[in-house]
Amino acid sequence: MFLLPCIVISWYVTKTPIPWYYATEIKNYLFARAHPEDGGWGLHIEGESSVFGTSLNYTVLRLVGVDADHPKMVKARATLHKLGGATHAPHWSKWWLAVMGVAHWDIVNPVPPELWLLPDWVPFAPWRWWIHIRQVYLPMSYLWSKRWQAEETDTIRSLRKELFVEDWDKIDWAAHRNTIHPRDNYHPKTWLLNMLNWILANVWTPVLRVKPLVKKAEDWAMKLIEMENENTDHLDLATVSGPMNLVALYARDGPDSYAVRRHKERSDEFLWVKDEGLLANGTNGVQCWDTAFAIQAVMDAGLTEDPRWRPMLLKALEFLDDQQIRENVKDQDKCYRQQRKGGWAFSNKDQGYAVSDCVSEALKSVIILQKTPGFPTLIDDRRIFDAIDTLLTYQNPNGSCSSYEPPRAGSWMEMLNAAEVFGRIMVEYEYPECTTAVVTALSLFHKHWPSYRSAEVERFVERAVAWIKTNQRPHGGWYGSWGICFTYATMFALESLASTGETYANSSHAKRGCDFLISKQREDGGWSEHYKVSPTPPPFYNLQPPNFQTRLTNLTPLHRPAKQANTSSTPPVLR
């Protein structure tokens, strides 16, 4: 629920017209997703109302023309005030409100672009952060340094009265830098970060921050933004950093520059309409990811040679052929990017960020089809090898795989996590889902090309599977981060073991994983898992429809009891 505000606020402050039909569907969606009891909004659609979600989505509704006296707005505003008002918002919300001029910049904890000037050997230099955080920090730091604010409007003046409990002119903005409602304080700032913020706000900024250094830092931050635009054709990594970059470029160049116009054109790719209205994706789609799994689903059903499925499968193969990333980014080392040649992105090659599991699933699908009689070889061996070369760069020292790149620093970096509403975001982490995807892709590749980098592939798989085993929880499951949650990761981990010949009959790890899933089967025969499994146990709750989790469980190597209907009470058979 925090993605749509990024786009809409960026439109408003850059004076981008919002078509009436966009405005209508945005109203429909946010009204449909308001909390049924208190009228507010949370971090996501299942979450309880928070200052973060309510302050930003209330603002969006005002920007698309909803009157402050509308009954739903009155109800939402009452909830926001009950939570303390926008002074109790987390860092990202305060930053957006400061960009609008609804809040004063003094309420925002320091975001100095000077960090980008640190030598690469510094343990906490920004290039070591997780890719999403460093891409968000770029425009955040640039605009904080400029203290840029949108042109004042009647709506902005009105929001100053609506979002805060105190009179706007009497608020001690600096005193509220660290004010946050407990509901938003998922990851409280550490003593170290609080100390650094105090030094930056009270010593560095007013006393030591000289103009030549500031200009150098701002220029380098903007150069990195420009490289991001060039490498993604102005899509940028995701729906948070992209709108922020639009505002930063608008602040520097005005409305008529190519970069600003292109950003506005491409922002539509993050939006989609469903029955409830218009909302935003976390990326510009899931095209490569979904295409790869659609191919594998047909394969698992034994239909790849069925002529009825051939037209769809051929188009899917042609799509993956077209969307393979054929080169590394320009100035790869200079802009701190991971090797990507031969890979696939989550969405498309324009966005251009290869991800370990996206590369793996697409590669498996290509191999499956191109090794099926009657399908053309659109992607030749050299391009297949390019994908393998990139996959082999993803392994971490402990054998696991992360998402976009291997970790560049340790988890201690979370001591500098300023977001407050998110944990485990400062660096890359290892994931059983990503590790499994790479293991299964390399295993399939090795069967067909046993001589290409053979020793490296075998060693990679051996170390990765060993890590999968050490990552198993005492109850037998695995914890996932890219899906909910134990069901999701256990499905992948068991697939890893199965791809190397470990089954229920011959592997204690596979047996424990299968037994774990069976122990969580519902009386109706299905499985369900609540999102609040993350981060605290117990891991399973019977609080949501079982269809999705049941499908995940049926995809695990239980000798595939997939014919069992969701309504069946017959347990799957383990052989």
Regions flagged by a language model, labelled:
Residues 1-575:
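Preference for long, amphipathic alpha-helical scaffolds in soluble/luminal domains
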